[in-house]
């Protein structure tokens, strides 16, 4: 947060410089179909994909797939949306996985979770040029419109990762705000000096 913003959480004060080295990031959130490939490749059984704490969680929980997934009587995967079971839609963003599951998926996919600073850099660069000035939103500083992001559950659910192209960041990254929450590598801690 910067001092020009009206409301900020006290543990988000204040913007401070961080060195961000070059990195790569996916242009959309991970989808159900991408995560399903991990599940069907025995990602929950392959202990080499899990860090020690994640493996402890996995063994305690007994999970072999995401908690809100199940196979129907025809062997098709379903996901739970409140009280309803729906067939997996390939382009919906992956939801309801914990940090350990996200990290295991990333290792399987030969990726990693972005650091918070990397994610913020990718999501909030200036709308005019790449410099130290952060934009408020991925597309710049103009207030969000309904065509740019699924905010405040206005659609009543999650949306296809291909939706909201007008909300893309300068880097062509889609849905950097709204729709679902994202995991980063960092543990949630207040900024230095808080």
Task: Annotate each predicted stretch with a short phrase.
Residues 22:
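A recurrent short beta-strand within the Rossmann-like NAD(P)-dependent oxidoreductase core
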């Amino acid at each position: 947060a910067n001092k020009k913003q009206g409301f900020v959480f006290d543990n988000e004060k204040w913007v401070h410089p961080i060195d961000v080295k070059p990195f790569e990031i996916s242009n959309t959130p991970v989808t159900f179909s991408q995560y399903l490939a991990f599940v069907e490749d025995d990602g929950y059984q392959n202990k080499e994909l899990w860090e020690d704490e994640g493996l402890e969680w996995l063994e305690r929980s007994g999970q072999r797939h995401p908690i809100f997934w199940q196979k129907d009587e025809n062997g098709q995967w379903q996901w739970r949306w409140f009280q309803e079971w729906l067939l997996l839609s390939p382009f919906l963003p992956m939801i309801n996985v914990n940090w350990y599951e996200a990290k295991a998926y990333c290792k399987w996919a030969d990726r990693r979770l972005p650091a918070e600073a990397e994610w913020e850099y990718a999501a909030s660069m200036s709308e005019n040029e790449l410099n130290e000035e952060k934009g408020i939103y991925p597309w710049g500083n103009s207030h969000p419109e309904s065509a740019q992001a699924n905010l405040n559950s206005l659609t009543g659910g999650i949306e296809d990762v291909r939706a909201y192209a007008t909300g893309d960041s300068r880097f062509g990254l889609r849905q950097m705000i709204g729709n679902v929450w994202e995991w980063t590598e960092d543990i949630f801690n207040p900024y230095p000096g808080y």
